[in-house]
Amino acid sequence: MWSTPSGPVFRRFVGAVATGVSLAATSGCTVPADAVAGISKTADGRLLGVMMVCGHQIDGATLSVASDDVDKQVTVGSWTADRPLTPGLATWTLDSPAAGWTATRSLAPLTAKTTYALYGWTKDNSWSANSISFTLADRDRLTPGKVRYDSISDNGGESAITVSIAEFKAKACQNM
């Protein structure tokens, strides 16, 4: 014999299931970060990618037009390290081949009033690097020996800061 659940009990059950399905659908899988991406400049003004690997490895980096909509992100450059980057600091020029790097997509011309994001990744999506967003105006304010990156505070907040390379090496992996 079948029994019909009472209205309030049934509604609570349906509400709980709907909430669970909603949470599962909206909680995207993210790749854990274990590195920090930044930008710098060479003495002759060329844009540098800077990567501080904190504990595991990073295989490459991509520069894209920053967008909250994944479908609107356009890759403007991508590089693969000849060997996985292990804990420590790595730099490479973005506009031309650099020793130890292969351009899998050569850098396209960057344009004013566009925000770009540089991030690091692994081939198997096991690790990533926190990205840095920047504009050409941000790039133009950089001086050689300085790195712009997103610093993560003790409470988890992020803010773009510019520091010396030595300070970047010392502090970038804090709060990871």
Sequence positions of predicted segments:
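A mature extracytoplasmic/lumenal domain signature
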Residues: V53, G120-T122
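Extended, well-structured beta-strand/loop surface patches
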Residues: S22, T62-T111, K123-G145
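Short, surface-exposed binding/anchoring microloops in extracellular/periplasmic proteins
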Residues: V36-P84, A172-N175
